[in-house]
Amino acid sequence: MKASKGRNVVVVGTQWGDEGKGKLVDWLTESAQGVVRFQGGHNAGHTLVINGVKTALHLIPSGIMRPGVKCYIGNGVVLSAGKLFEEIEGLEKAGVEVRSRLRVSEACPLILPFHAALDVAREAAREHGGAEKIGTTGRGIGPAYEDKIARRALRVQDLKYPERFAAKLRELLALHNHVLSTFLGSANFQFGDALKPYITGGQVQFEPVFEEAMRHAEMLKPMMADVSRELNEAHAAGANLLFEGAQGTLLDVDHGTYPYVTSSNCVAGNAAAGSGVGPGHLHYILGITKAYCTRVGGGPFPTELDWETPGTPGYHMSTVGAEKGVTTGRSRRCGWFDAALLKRSAQVNGLSGLCITKLDVLDGLRELSLCVGYELDGERIDLLPMGAEEIARCVPIYENIAGWTESTVGVTHYENLPSNARRYLERIEQVTGVPIAMISTSPDRDHTILMRHPYAAD
């Protein structure tokens, strides 16, 4: 194969998701010819603001907002065809051409209505039994990945063969309806309106699921592709590719705050497995991190603040940062920047550089705290532990840093930032050992400070 001059960049979240990856992916696609989603499902939410217009995406790569950029959904994504077409139709109404530019891997496992039903039932059963909820979005992501790992999933390619699809579907329904009946017996809850058309007497019915899947199949066929082959051919031809991670490192099923995690690998290494592009072709790993920390749902959060009481720094972050989930609308928990957490993320991702987002949210705070380590059971440590129970016992060790009252909104040159903002960023670099490549100073695409371009040659 001919040597390529193309450069491939992986973008990953370094915290618990919601770091602002969508904006940065959109910004970077000016230098890319293709953008790839490689894990997760429609539980992820990316918000883009372009010329003042806000667009929320859940499945389709953020590069779709750049005319001419090809977008790929890789084999590591679990796909709800219904949600995909909802998103396509919304973009088309806004004048965005999607279908000719989007390719979907035939190897993607499908999310079907019984996956969402299982997700909802399990969370209800946990709550009924007195256990803390995991905090899933209830969209069927986890159960769909379970079917994949158990080697029984229906995949996109199965949609091309109705008889094969029907036979596999009947087998899956027999299994999952049995499990559903067990959950229904242990918790009193109701399925939401979105699931009611598929369920009779607490059981997911074959006909509505099959008929809907066949309708989706006809619409999806023109976009089905061998995504691995297309990406490798594009790379060989010299194209720059961008791999767009969803969620964040601390939600990774292996490296996150287990069990309060998602069901996929969110780390940079999965960009290869989830797309079919070899790891030797991934040239730069950009870690996206907020200038503070947020988390949605349950699980330990060492630097969490009181974010509900007016007048507190946490409340400032929550309100000024508009910290509500794109997918669920749930309020995000807020806390100080955690450099010990970021050091863990830097290790497991092999970060080449950082992009600090939402720096402008800290405008007006006169004093900031930066977590540089923890005290755990009487011992000082400077790296986030692996276990959720240990993380929950961590007491943050803070450095206090002077804040700033000047506005950073819209600043596009580093030297124009307030001096205290520069000191804060430089201290983050020193403690984490990762150079800052980019800084975001508002949700707008153009409000970005570039220090080192990820697509520039080393």
Swiss-Prot record:
Amino-acid positions noted as binding substrate in the UniProt annotation, renumbered to this chain: V326, T327, T328, G329, R330, S331, R332
Keywords: Cytoplasm, GTP-binding, Ligase, Magnesium, Metal-binding, Nucleotide-binding, Purine biosynthesis
Record EC number: 6.3.4.4
First-tier enzyme category under EC: ligase
Catalytic activity as recorded in UniProt: IMP + L-aspartate + GTP = N(6)-(1,2-dicarboxyethyl)-AMP + GDP + phosphate + 2 H(+)
Chain ranges passing through the membrane: none
One MF term in the entry's GO annotations: GTP binding
Broad class of the protein's primary localization: cytoplasm
InterPro entries associated with the record: Adenylosuccin_syn_GTP-bd, Adenylosuccin_syn_Lys_AS, Adenylosuccinate_synth_dom1, Adenylosuccinate_synth_dom2, Adenylosuccinate_synth_dom3, Adenylosuccinate_synthetase, P-loop_NTPase
GO biological process: 'de novo' AMP biosynthetic process; IMP metabolic process
Annotated active site: D18, H46
Functional pathway: Purine metabolism; AMP biosynthesis via de novo pathway; AMP from IMP: step 1/2
Subunit and partners: Homodimer.
Protein role: Plays an important role in the de novo pathway of purine nucleotide biosynthesis. Catalyzes the first committed step in the biosynthesis of AMP from IMP.
Protein name: Adenylosuccinate synthetase
Species, as recorded: Acidovorax sp. (strain JS42)
Lineage: Bacteria, Pseudomonadati, Pseudomonadota, Betaproteobacteria, Burkholderiales
